[in-house]
Amino acid sequence: MGKTGGTSFRVFIESNVKKHYFGYGKTHVLTHEDLDIRDPSKFTELEPKGHSVFEHFDLFSEHAPWGLHRYLKTKEYQYITMLREPVSRTISAYRYAMDRGWINEDKNIIDWFHEKENKDKKHYQINYCSGVSIDAPLEIKLDKALINLKSENFLFGLTSKYNEFVDLCCLVNDWKPQYRRINITKAKKEISKDDRKELEELLLDEINFYEEAVNIYNKKYKKVTI
């Protein structure tokens, strides 16, 4: 998922898996949460080697929802992701869009949030963890997302406990750790208290989901000695 673990986490995973496939812009058409974008037939247009990649590679790395396992031959698969406090994640996505020049610096974060192309932001992590259509009722998406988080095929951590999750991944998969370095970044656009408060209201479903995910994380991995 975008703006959770970052490039550091992807590099950590790829350093531990010999045959990794960075399918950015390719595999998402198989599982995209927006059914207007999800189009499995498009994958063979984007990937010259077609579905044979699912038999060759051991890691598929991209911002894509739950569901890619349906295209794998093996039944032994593992989803790995990190979850982030929703307001913090949304602000990070907004600043990233600004840094990339996708929006002007005078664009208010609330106005940006309500733009049509950002309709996924309200339930962003719920959508990704559920693999259900973005337009499905919240109850269906939420139930599926929580079921997936509890699955043994889903290894997840929290951005706030980054190094702890790296250790967990290493313990579960017998990997070598690679911890995040402290980055020095340029000054960031400040978000007003009023805008933060409004984001909390807009992201209430995501916040409730995140809090439940934290509870699942604590119960699921409490017996794991790190």
Give the label of every model feature segment.
Residues F12-I13, V172, A213:
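Hydrophobic residues on the short alpha-helix immediately C-terminal to a glycine-rich phosphate/catalytic loop
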Residues D34-I37, E45, E62-W66, G131, ...:
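PAPS-dependent sulfotransferase catalytic core
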